[in-house]
Amino acid sequence: WQGFLEIDPADPASIAANSVSLTRESVRGIDRMGGTILHTSRTDPRTHQATDKTGQVLDVLDKLGIDAMVTLGGDGTLRFSAHLSRLGVKVISIPK
């Protein structure tokens, strides 16, 4: 969720700096790489810096044209994914 919190929906430069479009070419060979390409973090947007950032996450999803998400993670990711689902975001969650 950290990447979503770094994006300012009104600033195209921050979108470009904090997101990557996945294409056939960009994901080719991932299966032969070790480690992770996901750049994970332990951030809960509901408690980030003592301010609920759910609205910002929803704005970023809208700005990026994301109408469904597949989330992979632990308890925190699954909890926030369920929170987004209750708000109408289409989410498929996969526990780690």
Feature map (PLM): residue ranges:
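A generic "cationic amphipathic patch" detector
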Residues: T51, A82-H83
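Gly/Ser/Thr-rich loops at beta-strand to alpha-helix junctions
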Residues: L72-R79
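Hydrophobic/aromatic ligand-binding patch that stacks against planar heteroaromatic rings
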Residues: V60, H83-L84
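Glycine-rich oxoanion-binding loops at beta->alpha junctions
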Residues: D8-T71
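Short, acidic/small-residue loops that bind anionic groups at enzyme active sites
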Residues: L84-K96
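Short, well-ordered secondary-structure micro-motifs
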Residues: I7-D8, A82
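Short connector loops at secondary-structure junctions
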Residues: W1-I7
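Structural motif
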Residues: T71-L72, I94
